[in-house]
């Protein structure tokens, strides 16, 4: 039976989830997780406490409880459960009070207030990424914060969407296709925005696996074609001095982080 994990908050529970996932990912185990947001009343807290206690009685193991609860009276109810408590907010508050010389003034949902302020920017960035995906149009490249380049199936679209959704970055992407290989060069719209260009590449063998799973027994998915495309595109990156990263065996989160690190782009939101 998988160890039970609770992510609890009097807000969205995003903070508890992020920290909890980061900690638990250090262990080669699987967990049965339940997220419970908006535990804003003592009645709700008592109901959650009952869930935790029932889980302990059923499994004989104390559930792991990751929480970020601002209200002390609600937090105390969760503390009194049979769960093993990991309280992220208050673990850091007391030491910081000493360092800053200021008493904390907790405010519910303050941690996500910036999300409300930047909601429109996030939506604009997502819409931009979708409208400028895979070279659908070259008309709005001047408005991009970032333009990703690469062969088909190297990770351009998921990276663009992740950057827009997570950080509010307007990320366009442009594909280099088989037809481009004989005379590979940057289109004029990309030349005008060369300072925004960032390349993605991938190991040919991995590219072959990805394409083969979608279009087997085609020239497009052949290992030879994958090798040709990757080689030509990497040569273009070097010729044009375009920074690039290899996406092989990296998650979209890791790819996005590498892009931000290399480009110095500012995260528009957290």
From Swiss-Prot:
Top-level division of the source organism's lineage: Bacteria
Catalytic activity: [pyruvate, water dikinase] + ADP = [pyruvate, water dikinase]-phosphate + AMP + H(+); [pyruvate, water dikinase]-phosphate + phosphate + H(+) = [pyruvate, water dikinase] + diphosphate
Family matches, as InterPro entries: Kinase-pyrophosphorylase, PSRP
Any one GO molecular function term: ATP binding
E.C. numbers: 2.7.11.33, 2.7.4.28
Coiled-coil blocks: none
UniProt keyword Acyltransferase present: no
Assigned keywords, A-Z: Kinase, Nucleotide-binding, Serine/threonine-protein kinase, Transferase
Sites where the protein binds ADP: 150-157
Reported function: Bifunctional serine/threonine kinase and phosphorylase involved in the regulation of the phosphoenolpyruvate synthase (PEPS) by catalyzing its phosphorylation/dephosphorylation.
Family indicated by similarity: Belongs to the pyruvate, phosphate/water dikinase regulatory protein family. PSRP subfamily.
NCBIfam families reported in the protein's UniProt record: PRK05339.1
Classification via HAMAP family: PSRP (MF_01062)
Listed name of the protein: Putative phosphoenolpyruvate synthase regulatory protein
